[in-house]
Design a protein with these regions (language model features):
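The Walker A (P-loop) glycine that initiates the GxxxxGKT/S ATP-binding motif of P-loop NTPases
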Residues: 221, 284, 306
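Walker A/P-loop
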Residues: 219-259, 324
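Short beta-strand elements
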Residues: 18-24, 282, 386-389
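Peripheral, non-AAA+ core regions of ATP-driven protein-machinery
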Residues: 1-218, 222-228, 330, 470-471, ...
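Basic, amphipathic alpha-helical bundle interface domains used for macromolecular binding and assembly
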Residues: 39-44, 59, 66-76, 288-289, ...
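P-loop NTPase nucleotide-binding/switch module
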Residues: 170-209, 213, 240-294
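Walker B catalytic acidic pair
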Residues: 299, 305-307, 317
Length: 511
């Protein structure tokens, strides 16, 4: 008897429906074809044990299973459940009524219980798109899949529940979530607040500009100056995520199995990988491709603490994603693109000792050591960071103040107003949402300068020997400063402030 059941495979952040054809005929043997990997090939052992431990058995006949399309490699143990259901249906142990309306996924334990799978959200989206009515998967993934409306999500804890469901002995209660209502109910501010930061008013101003225009920023200062504290509070002043952004973000995190039992991600991601991470961990890839940190930070913040401590090769692979807002992983058999529209926040000490330019500490690093230290960060990478700012230690008088600083809520209101201005400006440009994303044509249209501003910028370019990319960065930051001031035109004062935020371009940085 030939039976078809349906599962799904995830490539990148998109799913592809897999047809599992099970044929049982005279003879003996278990044959699984259709380009399965080792984990899928081993499924027969898990299925046999799970069936035996739940009062069922493999039929004593020849079982041939084809997983189509055959040119796509099937990876992982998430096909255990659909394979088991297909075998039971083909052997007549469970009813096959309406089974073609189901997508089924789940990894079996030997006792028949189910382990969570990766990519439940993209699978649910694809199932809805292709007209499937029901999606059976492990209970731990049910909230995640139920984000998708108009498909019945059936979360189960073990194989027996699925068998009883098809045999009409018991019904599985669907998991239902009103996605929009849940989203708007759970939008909340992150746990960190800028009011906790004593002093550092000029740095807070930089962070506000960065948040308003989506600009990348690097903080340079000695240990204990507050760089990490400031960076962790940046998400608290970014505009709340839209529902579409929340779905995009959740989809990426679903692929790596990071949203089990949680459902929709409501707050902007903040990712802070250790400086020992590899280039694959940062940008994604591997033998079985997975999103890297830059994609997990999509629609949020990627914080690279102690930037020069990262391997130079690791930092260099990030250059293109910073420009393109996506990363493409190419291999002989496939090409996968992951979104990576994130704000980069980096921090670093000004020298190996950490105290260069600190008048209260002795300089213990030689010019050669400092040059070697800073050379780990290439010029092209620095050019892609819009704002460079020096962070100095907070004096005792400021630390001992009881008065709290401005709250994140207050700063966020100004940032959101600036973003509204940008949304209106770029309404006819679907790929551009804020100033940091402007291309050359948009710069020429929206960043026109007066004669005074042009002269000021020309002098800065010549004196600091700035690159063409740095020129573009200054214009973008100036445009954001003008938006925060609710001014239509870019003034000389806006250009002047933006030039100040190119610390690492200044002559004499190394003394």
């Amino acid at each position: 008897m030939l039976i078809k059941v349906y599962g799904s495979a995830v490539f990148g952040i998109e799913a592809t429906t897999i047809t599992i054809e099970v044929n049982i005929d005279k003879g003996i043997g278990y044959h699984l074809v259709g380009l399965p990997d080792k984990a899928v090939s081993e499924s027969s052992y898990r299925i046999s044990a799970a069936l035996s431990n739940n009062g069922f058995k493999l039929p004593g006949k020849k079982i041939i299973i084809n997983m189509a399309p055959a040119d796509i490699r099937k990876e992982g143990a998430a096909y255990d459940l659909p394979l088991a259901i297909g075998i039971l249906t083909a052997s007549g142990q469970i009813k096959s009524k309406n089974i073609e309306q189901y997508i089924i996924m789940g990894e079996l334990s030997l006792d028949g219980s189910l382990q969570p799978v990766k990519g439940a959200l993209p699978i649910a989206l694809k199932a809805k798109e292709e007209g499937f009515k029901h999606f059976i998967l492990p209970e731990k993934n049910a909230k995640e899949a139920a984000i998708v409306n108009d498909i019945e999500v059936l979360g189960v804890n073990n194989m027996t529940e699925v068998i009883n469901h098809f045999n009409e002995k018991e019904q599985i209660t669907p998991t239902v979530i009103d996605t929009q209502a849940e989203f708007y109910k759970n939008i909340d501010f992150p746990e960190f607040d800028f009011s906790d930061v004593k002093g550092q008013e000029s740095i807070k101003r930089c962070m506000e500009i960065a948040a308003a225009g989506g600009h990348n920023i690097i903080l340079i200062g000695p240990p204990g100056a507050g760089k990490t504290m400031l960076a962790k509070r940046l998400p608290s002043i970014l505009p709340p995520m839209t529902l579409q952004e929340a779905l995009e973000t959740t989809k990426i995190h679903s692929v790596v199995g990071k949203v089990q039992n949680t459902g929709l991600i409501y707050q902007r991601p903040f990712r802070s990988p250790h400086h020992s991470c590899s280039d694959v961990a940062l940008v994604g890839g591997g033998q079985y491709p997975q999103p890297g940190e830059i994609s997990l930070a999509h629609n949020g913040v990627l914080f690279l603490d102690e930037l020069p401590e990262f391997k130079r090769s690791v930092l260099e692979v990030m250059r293109q994603p910073l420009e393109d807002r996506e990363v493409t992983i190419s291999r002989a058999r496939f090409t996968i693109t992951y979104p990576s529209s994130f704000m980069l926040v980096a921090s670093m000490n000004p020298s190996p000792s950490g105290y260069f330019n600190d008048t209260n500490a002795p300089i213990t690093s030689s010019p050669t050591e400092m040059l070697r230290y800073l050379s780990k960060i290439s010029g092209p990478l620095l050019d892609r960071i819009d704002i460079h700012i020096e962070v100095t230690p907070v004096p005792f008088e400021k630390l001992s103040e009881e008065r709290k600083g401005e709250t994140s809520v207050s700063i966020r209101k100004r940032v959101t107003k600036a973003r509204v201005i940008q949304s209106e400006r770029f309404k006819d440009f679907p790929m551009t949402h804020y100033n940091a994303q402007m291309n050359v044509k948009q710069l020429n249209e929206f960043c026109k300068l007066s004669t005074e501003s042009k002269l000021l910028l020309k002098n800065a370019m010549e004196k600091l020997n700035l690159s063409a990319r740095a020129y573009d960065r200054i214009l973008k930051v100036s445009r954001t400063i003008a938006d925060l001031a609710n001014e239509k035109d870019i003034c000389a004062s806006h250009i002047s402030e933006a030039i100040q935020y190119r610390s690492l371009d200044r002559e004499g940085w190394l003394g």
